[in-house]
Amino acid sequence: MENTRMTIHMCYLTILLLLALLAPPCTPVSDTDDGSNSAGVDGSHRARAEATVADILSAHNEARRKVGVEPLKWSQGIARYAKDYARSRRADCAPRRSSLFYFGENIEVGKGRRWGAGALVAQWVDEGRWYDYGSSSCSAPAGSSGCGRYTQVVWRNTTQLGCGKIVCDSGDTLLVCDYFPPGNYGTGRPY
């Protein structure tokens, strides 16, 4: 009788061990994240995260190249901060600046979940059409975002960038990019 109980217990333990080994991870990868904090994610999600980072850097550095400014480098630490802040806005998806003024910051909301990060950054770069370098002024129409997001993208003293992209509860896409050192300070020109 004792031998039979021991055999049954061993069978149960073996089955539990097999189930644990075959079960999916406890924290599945969500389609609401871009993967910029990619520890422990599957290969396809990591590839999407790397493509998102490449799109963001490419869009920024192309705008910087056009005005003769050095390219930005990606910072994982800054990206973690940006991602955490973006996640804190998941419920309202509001493009409000974070309280940490140590970084420069650009925020964009795209209607719907399929916005690519490069397309969101392009909205900031597009503000450059209203920026006049000669007078260091902005002629953006009333009600627009102005030129401040563009000037942050091309600010010559900024060297590092980190961003976080999420899909909000509303289904819209929120992109937060933080910059170090911050731009848009003083009365100087961005480049």
Q: What is each model feature region?
A:
Residues 95-121:
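A solvent-exposed, acidic/Ser-Thr-rich amphipathic alpha-helical stretch
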Residues 17-35, 39-42:
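N-terminal signal peptide
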Residues 1-16:
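Classical eukaryotic N-terminal signal peptides for Sec-dependent ER targeting/secretion
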